[in-house]
Amino acid sequence: DCEFSYRDSIFRRSAAGKYFITSIKIKLSKLPPKGPFYAGVETYFQNNNIPTDNITAAQILNAVAKIRADKLPDPKLIPSAGSFFKNAIISAKQADGLKDAYGDKIPLFDLNDGRYKISTGWLIDKAGLKGVELHGMCPHFKNALVLTNVSARNFNDLALAREEIKSIVKGKFGIEIEQEPLEI
């Protein structure tokens, strides 16, 4: 009914602003998890010699926690607005233009409909903004999607940083990036 998918649901589309979710119930499977797992988890298991034929939920939890700790700032130490921008959707023509300019190592995911998803963190990094303070906010040096608070005093500082990042990325690549968190 809610059309849940990765970072999406009706609450971001047709039901946006109509409901306020106060609780949820989740039914978990008692069966062992089955791969394939996302690439970072697969790599973690390979690098740590963990066989994936009989993997447990606890092993997946530990892998994801370690991967996130390596990629994201510790919220106990560094305040942030979290993962702040969605990965952008671009046309095949835009993807080809980026490949011509930057080679084939661009983080692109083929959506198999003539469009590609591109890492917005990569765009922010290549725009020269990773680790640069803007209005008291800073795209984190480990993951440019995460906006850390260096000296911002209020929402207005965050909004100014957001708009400047969007403008610079649009100016450099011609790609609109979109804020992930909903404002209420």
Q: What is each residue range found by the language model?
A:
Residues 167-168:
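Recognition helices and adjacent regulatory flanks at domain boundaries
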Residues 3-156, 172, 176-184:
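Phosphate/pyrophosphate- and phosphate-bearing ligand-binding catalytic cores of soluble enzymes
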